[in-house]
Design a protein with these regions (language model features):
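Generic C-terminal helix-cap and adjacent flexible tail
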Residues: 121-127
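Short aromatic/basic micro-patch
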Residues: 23, 50, 72, 98
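N-terminal strand-loop-strand
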Residues: 1-23, 51, 55
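Active-site-adjacent beta-strand/loop module that shapes the phosphate/pyrophosphate-binding cleft
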Residues: 61-86, 120
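The catalytic Nudix box helix
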Residues: 24-57, 78
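Conserved hydrophobic "DFG−1" position in protein kinase catalytic cores
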Residues: 2, 10, 80-82, 98
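NUDIX/MutT-family hydrolases
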Residues: 79, 88-120
Length: 127
């Protein structure tokens, strides 16, 4: 979760999974890549921003439709701080913007993002 001046970075997903939903930037880990390196790369690819990746903020999972589910994704969200770049949607993001944490609930979010916000409610979000 990239935090800048009290706002969080959201992207609108352009890829097939959760298409059109708003979420924090993220994606798959490449073979041989650390989780933190993957997080920094995904933010750069999807938003054009360079980030310093900090502590683990949240761990969760999400399942696709069907039985068995169409997909099962493990989620590890880190605190991120912008250190460079210029904001702009790229790669599989159709839009990218900073929004106030409380305002994020007004966006069309996947269930995993709603759970993340529920878990953070009332907590001091690190910057």
């Amino acid at each position: 979760m990239v935090i800048d001046e009290g706002c969080i970075l959201l992207i609108r997903r352009g890829a097939a999974i959760e298409h059109g939903k708003w979420a924090i930037p993220g994606g798959k880990v490449n073979y041989g890549e650390t989780l933190r390196a993957a997080a920094a790369r995904e933010v750069l690819e999807e938003t054009g921003l360079e980030v310093e990746v900090g502590a683990v903020l949240w761990v969760g999972e999400t399942f696709g439709e069907g039985d068995p589910p169409a997909h099962h994704i493990g989620l590890v969200d880190f605190v991120g701080r912008v250190v460079g770049g210029e904001l702009g949607a790229a790669d599989d993001a159709d839009d990218a913007r900073f929004v106030e944490l409380a305002e994020a609930r007004n966006f069309d979010l996947p269930s995993s993002m709603q759970r993340l916000l529920d878990d953070l409610q009332g907590s001091e979000v690190p910057t």
